[in-house]
Curated annotation (Swiss-Prot):
Entry's transmembrane regions: 12-32
Protein family per UniProt: Belongs to the ATPase B chain family.
UniProt xrefs under CDD domains: ATP-synt_Fo_b
Record protein name field: ATP synthase subunit b
Organism, as annotated: Pseudomonas aeruginosa (strain UCBPP-PA14)
Protein's cellular compartments: Cell inner membrane
Protein function: F(1)F(0) ATP synthase produces ATP from ADP in the presence of a proton or sodium gradient. F-type ATPases consist of two structural domains, F(1) containing the extramembraneous catalytic core and F(0) containing the membrane proton channel, linked together by a central stalk and a peripheral stalk. During catalysis, ATP synthesis in the catalytic domain of F(1) is coupled via a rotary mechanism of the central stalk subunits to proton translocation. Component of the F(0) channel, it forms part of the peripheral stalk, linking F(1) to F(0).
Assigned GO CC terms: plasma membrane; proton-transporting ATP synthase complex
Length: 156
């Protein structure tokens, strides 16, 4: 192998080319590679954060769903209790109103019975006086007639 000026010239040119590349070409390529590597790392970190956030969101949504179901069940239970309470109150009011109406009706019946008894006593007294007049053949004066009817009504 002969070392001549061409080989030395080519070596010097290659060395200059390498220096030129190291000085002007290599730094932007390295910077671009580092920037790309940083973007990829940031993207992976963002993807990991997004995956964790998604998992937390799923857990939070599940928790909120469970809480909403529990709250809905509690509201339904309270509504059932309130409905039963309203039914019981209505039943008690109806019973009280029924007893009041029954007592009022009994009082009216008692009052009507007493007035019928009084009317019957007066009629019986009048019939008795009329019968007595017919039997005796004479008329009793009005004052005596009234006293006799009152006395007879009191006895009956």
């Amino acid at each position: 192998m002969n070392i001549n000026a061409t080989l030395i010239g080519q070596s010097v040119a290659f060395f200059i080319f390498v220096l030129f590349c190291m000085k002007f070409v290599w730094p932007p390529v390295i910077a671009a590679l580092q920037e790309r590597q940083k973007k990829i790392a940031d993207g992976l970190d963002a993807a990991n954060r997004a995956a964790r956030d998604l998992e937390l969101a799923h857990e939070k949504a599940g928790q909120q769903l469970r809480e909403a179901k529990a709250q809905a069940a509690e509201i339904v239970e309270q509504a059932k209790k309130r409905a039963n309470q309203i039914v019981d109150e209505a039943r008690d009011q109806a019973r009280t109103e029924g007893e009041r109406l029954k007592a009022q009706a009994q009082a009216e019946i008692e009052q009507e019975l007493n007035s019928v008894k009084d009317a019957l006593r007066a009629q019986v007294g009048a019939l008795a006086v009329t019968g007595a007049e017919k039997i005796l053949g004479a008329s009793i004066d009005a004052n005596a007639h009234e006293q006799l009817v009152s006395k007879l009504a009191a006895e009956i």
